[in-house]
Amino acid sequence: MVLIRVLANLVMLHLSYGEKSSELVIGGRPCNINQHRSLALLYNSSGFLCGGTLINQQWVLSAAHCDMENMQIYLGLHNFSLPNMDQKRRVAEEKFFCLSNKSYTKWDKDIMLIKLNRRVKTSTHIAPLSLPSNPPRLRSVCRIMGWGSITSPRETLPYVPHCANIMILRYWVCRAIYGSLPAKSRTLCAGVPRRRIGSCLGDSGGPLICNGQIQGIASWGSDPCVNHGAPGVYTKVFDYNDWIQSIIAGNTAATCPP
């Protein structure tokens, strides 16, 4: 009953959505119901919306800037107006950040690891996604997904998550467009040159999936979204593998790479 009430609130949020949220897929298509079994929705009653990725039965990976009070985490969700029988709602038992004060920048440490209050079982619409065994190759075709806005600057939230394929680009492409980026960072630059395809408001924290592994976390991009085909910036998960695995193993004092 609680889950039904919350989903009703989410539907109302879509009907009345104004000018708030955090990053959605522009230029994509509705995901197939079985294409996003690891995708999590992070939500609270104020209407803050983000994505996340289930990486094992009790842990979700998202972006640090997606942290919110009274966070609710939905797994196995496809259509806001038509609940799946196996979808689950969880809350955060603990949240971990690279720095204790949750300090991050547009090019560094925008990563959050969430321990769920209860485990979830693999089911028809729920399954964890593997961490990367290697960094993604240049020009790899990867998939993004989320419930973010499908239009920009005016925001339009979909009832089902949207998916799109984008490409890993050279880091200097993002650096040339976003002059504030340093010479090196633990991020990935991804998009489709000269095409308006990419993440937008409400997609932040969601996955960049390459060859069945989570390689990136949607972090930030242009405003309006994918303006003139501008690529997005994604936290490079491979660089944080050791930190993630250490935290999950119980070493809560583990530190992120410098």
From Swiss-Prot:
Domain Peptidase S1 span(s) in chain numbering: 25-249
PANTHER family: KALLIKREIN-1, KALLIKREIN-RELATED
Activity regulation (UniProt): Inhibited by diisopropylfluorophosphate (DFP) and PMSF, and partially by soybean trypsin inhibitor, but not by EDTA.
Intracellular or extracellular location(s): Secreted
Residues of the propeptide: 19-24
Glycosylation site list: N44, N79, N101
This protein's name: Alpha-fibrinogenase
CDD domains the record matches: Tryp_SPc
Annotated function: Degrades alpha chain of fibrinogen (FGA), and has strong caseinolytic activity. Cleaves oxidized insulin B-chain at '40-Tyr-|-Leu-41', '48-Phe-|-Phe-49' and '49-Phe-|-Tyr-50', and glucagon at the bonds '62-Tyr-|-Ser-63', 66-Leu-|-Asp-67' and '78-Leu-|-Met-79' bonds.
Gene3D superfamilies in alphabetical order: Trypsin-like serine proteases
Any further remark recorded for this protein: Lacks esterolytic activity.
